[in-house]
Amino acid sequence: MSASIIAIILSAAMLHAVWNAIVKTAVDRTTTLGLVALGQVLPGAVMVSILPLPSIESFIYIVLSTLVHFAYFFLLGRAYQHGDLSVVYPIARGIVPALVSLWAMLLLGEVLPALAWVGIGLIIVGILLSNWKALRSGVGKTTLGLALGTGFCISIYSLVDGVGVRLSGNTLSYWAWGAFLHLFIAGLLGWHKRKTMVQLPLKIWAVGITGGLVSMTAYGLVLYAKNFAPLGAVSALRETSVIFATLIGFFVLKEGNWKRRLGAAVLMV
């Protein structure tokens, strides 16, 4: 893997952690997530107007991915209401490789090597380490459950998009339609928070939509990198975002227990 591709993947990882930090710091996270979704619709609309259609077979996967993304947004917002960025994000992202491996075993009949089971075990240890004190007192169970649910959704839409993009015949078109269909997520969240939305200052609108643009850019960089490097290597390096999120949590959001949480994040990576 070339140095330029490594830099692109690390940039994507950092950007993903940044837009999650934007959501975490918002006063009304549901409203902000609606704006993040809207921020993906705008460039998506431009792209679908100039790119060829993906294959008809892939549209069911685009729609299914959109539905799972709605659940993902809902759980992510709730998780950040209850827990720190440096706890929620590493758990939600950290369990994805383990879950995808399990889906491959259960649905595709792949046999997991012993090293993969060791990796899954380390992820579990990392999750327990990041939440140890809270779990002992009982206050971290809600955060853990929501973070795990968020990670479950990520693993499902990753699997769906992995199949769908192969059927699409055009990676950019698949990506663009996925972004454009966030219109439904933005619409549902916007209707739910319609009174709040009309009263928001322009600064909040700008921050939320910027988060959407950052999110879409991060995903686009990963898609680009996958054209030039093995998928497994890209995915593994992509998970360095959990370290970026932990560092943002400590240096920017002033969250505590950063040494233990950073150690847990590194362990999960």
Predicted regions and their residues:
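Hydrophobic transmembrane alpha-helices of multi-pass small-molecule transport proteins
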Residues: 41-44, 101-105, 114-132, 260-269
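Membrane-interface interhelical linkers
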Residues: 1-67, 73-85, 132-146, 179-216, ...
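Juxtamembrane helix-start motifs in multi-pass secondary transporters
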Residues: 32-35, 88, 173-174, 234
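Hydrophobic alpha-helical transmembrane segments in multi-pass integral membrane proteins
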Residues: 44-54, 100-116, 153-170, 214-232
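Alpha-helical transmembrane segments of multi-pass integral membrane proteins
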Residues: 121-122, 126, 143-161, 178-182, ...
